[in-house]
Amino acid sequence: MKLPKEGDFITIQSYKHDGNLHRTWRDTMVLKTTENAIIGVNDHTLVTESDGRRWVTREPAIVYFHKKYWFNIIAMIRDNGTSYYCNLASPYYLDNEALKYIDYDLDVKVFADGEKRLLDVEEYERHKKQMHYSDDLDFILKENVKILVDWINNGRGPFSDAYVNIWYKRYVELKNR
């Protein structure tokens, strides 16, 4: 698979552990691709849920995917500041169809005022039983929650204002070409 270039549009597909398609984002603009990471932006992007419902993202959001870490990060740029939605998920896989990952239910939300919340713990525990998450997988995901919280607490990567500003500025430049 040829890596997408800056300005290319890709589809993102989220799956569940049992292989079922969970959610699809159409036309995410790629801002940067490296050997291990993809940075993109969603802005009024069409999202299709597994039940067929469709909606459009409201604000620009910088998205970060990595091949090493078991999470992805969405930095939502809002009038009152940047909020984050972080999915505990498999490292991404890229093929000719889409960027793909498995969503493991647990989410960390960071509000513009810095408040953090771990979400969907009950859903995670339910799916862990239903879909037979292994003990090794459970350990990996819980360790990655710790890594993610460390990134948040230390303003690392996508949790840095400078990071969000640089990539949003680049998006505006590309959009207006």
Swiss-Prot record:
It is an enzyme of class 3 (hydrolase). Its EC number is 3.6.1.15, 3.6.1.6. Its cofactor is Mg(2+). The active site is at R23 (proton donor). The keyword Ribosomal protein does not apply. Mg(2+) 1 binds at N87, D103, D107. It catalyses: a ribonucleoside 5'-triphosphate + H2O = a ribonucleoside 5'-diphosphate + phosphate + H(+); a ribonucleoside 5'-diphosphate + H2O = a ribonucleoside 5'-phosphate + phosphate + H(+). Keywords: Hydrolase, Magnesium, Metal-binding. One of its GO terms (molecular function) is magnesium ion binding. Transmembrane segments: none annotated. The keyword Magnesium applies. SUPFAM superfamilies: FomD-like. Pfam families: DUF402 (PF04167). Mg(2+) 2 binds at D105, D107, D120, E123. It comes from the Bacteria. Belongs to the Ntdp family. NCBIfam families: PRK13662.1. PANTHER family: PTHR39159, UPF0374 PROTEIN YGAC. Has nucleoside phosphatase activity towards nucleoside triphosphates and nucleoside diphosphates. This is Nucleoside triphosphate/diphosphate phosphatase. It comes from Streptococcus sanguinis (strain SK36). The lineage of its organism: Bacteria, Bacillati, Bacillota, Bacilli, Lactobacillales.
